Amino acid sequence: MDPHGWPGVPYLEGSTEHRVPTAVDRGRRGPAGKEGDGFLNPAMSGNRTRSVLMLKHLANTSLRGVQKIQTIDSMCATGIRTRRWLNELPGDIASRLRVKMCDMNENALEWARSNLRNDPLGHNVSVIRGDARKELLSQGWHWIDIDPYGSPMPFLDLAMQATARRSVVSISATDTAALSGSSRGPLKRRYGAQVRLDPLKHDSGLRVLLGAAAVAAARHDRVITPLLSVWDSHHLRVTVLVDRSKRGANAYQDSIGWRVANPSQRDVELAIGAGLLPPHDAGSTPMHVMLPLSASPSDRSNVSGPLWTGIMGDAELMRSLSGEAASLICGSGDSALDTNEQKYARQSVRNIEKEANAILSLIHISEPTRRRTI
């Protein structure tokens, strides 16, 4: 049975026409409210576009041998992310997906079911009302998408525990004020970290989130490899490859440490000795350095951490997230709408391809009129 108000109004994202209860401002930025029937936040469209492109790339690389890609779209709301996977991925990849969509809002799920009804691959999707934390543990997953309202910390351990032998986990965090150091109490309580309020605060926030993912993975004999780390408007998002490896889990602390601003010469020497700074930087005074966890700086006023000190992305995957690739997934048949969607799609991957070989692999996607900063 269709939900009250069906068919509602059309909303186009990528090349997928989705039905929602009320009109959505396609250009809206920033966070949305936690409550509401038929929830859909257009500010997360870039997040979903990158999700489509990453799944396309990884289905042919890291997950190439997986015939049925067991996927969970937790906190799915009306299901726009899953529908974009089904409609915008090449058919040979989309047909491999076995998706479970779950949410606590029954009305949103009714809209999701009705939206799926005419999708050719809708039969490969199950729509479940329930707590994502319970559904995560219902089976092993090759692809896990965590997109909560606020902090992802309540879901991290369960997600890592639920991964298959090799899996991809995408983690969104909208508690940006905490992760970027503005709200120190929540940052300390949730992540056990501190972040210095400086131009690198969002980089540090991404690294704190990666560090939390690495620690959670290690608790369950897993090891992470960062694939993409993005600050986009009001949220942070990291995507990691997760492999089962007791040896890798034992060594997780090798990639956890501290960021020190205005370092002393001793800090520089420690960073070089730990392999976190090139030897040719000896004698210089960089703006900041990474130090290993064992360094435990005594002066915490210029320190961020504990956080991830390794690279934050995979160059091959990042090169696949090009403006051209993003534009190609936008083709509804309406040239005017397609042009607009192509603009949004290209914006969602702006700078990623050309930063593929950057040593920090940090991507900052901000307002269209602002430039990326590292």
Regions found by a protein language model. Give the residues of each.
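Class I SAM-dependent methyltransferase "Motif I" SAM/SAH-binding loop
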Residues: 73-80
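Cys/His-rich short segments
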Residues: 246-334, 338-349, 353
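Conserved beta-strand signature within the Rossmann-like core of class I S-adenosyl-L-methionine
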Residues: 166-174
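S-adenosyl-L-methionine
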Residues: 2-65, 69, 81-88, 102, 106-141
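Short beta-strand element of Class I
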Residues: 96-100
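Residue-level detector of conserved catalytic or cofactor/ligand-binding positions
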Residues: 363-374
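A short glycine-rich, Lys/Arg-flanked "PGG" loop and its adjoining helix->strand segment in the class I
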Residues: 156-167
